[in-house]
Design a protein with these regions (language model features):
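A short, N-terminal "cap"/entry segment at the start of jelly-roll beta-barrel domains
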Residues: 1-34
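Glycine- and acidic-residue-biased ligand/ion/polar-headgroup-sensing regions
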Residues: 53-68, 75
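Ligand-binding loop in jelly-roll beta-barrel domains
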Residues: 83-108
Length: 109
């Protein structure tokens, strides 16, 4: 597994497709059996429509702030969304840095 020592440096950031222009992500873990963990860097003026996922999603705001559902989520805020739960819309006026964790996909037989 690739190890990243400095999460805040400018290395290993990539354009986050499917998000507002200027959104960047740094993949910390991407494992089919263990899920995915990323740092998501929201630019000023970020916005995203409501959506859902087939796995649970967790947010921990490290820097900045975002708004969703009429509430503000500043640094230190945590949210968890269940599998299939619609969440959003999201916006960030000044940008934010968020730790995002998705649970692994589980196949039900």
């Amino acid at each position: 597994m690739k190890r990243i020592k400095n999460l805040y440096d400018e290395l290993n950031w990539e354009t986050a497709t499917g998000y507002s222009k200027g959104t960047k992500r740094k993949v910390l873990r991407d494992d089919d059996n263990k899920g995915q963990t990323i740092l998501l860097k929201l630019p000023e003026g970020f916005n995203m429509a409501p959506h859902s996922h087939i796995t649970a999603e967790q947010h921990f705001v490290l820097e900045g702030e975002y708004q969703s559902g009429g509430e503000s989520y500043p640094a230190g805020s945590y949210q968890i969304f269940s599998s299939g739960e619609e969440h959003g819309p999201f916006e960030s006026k000044k940008g934010a840095l968020i730790l995002v964790v998705w649970d692994p996909l589980q196949v039900v037989q």
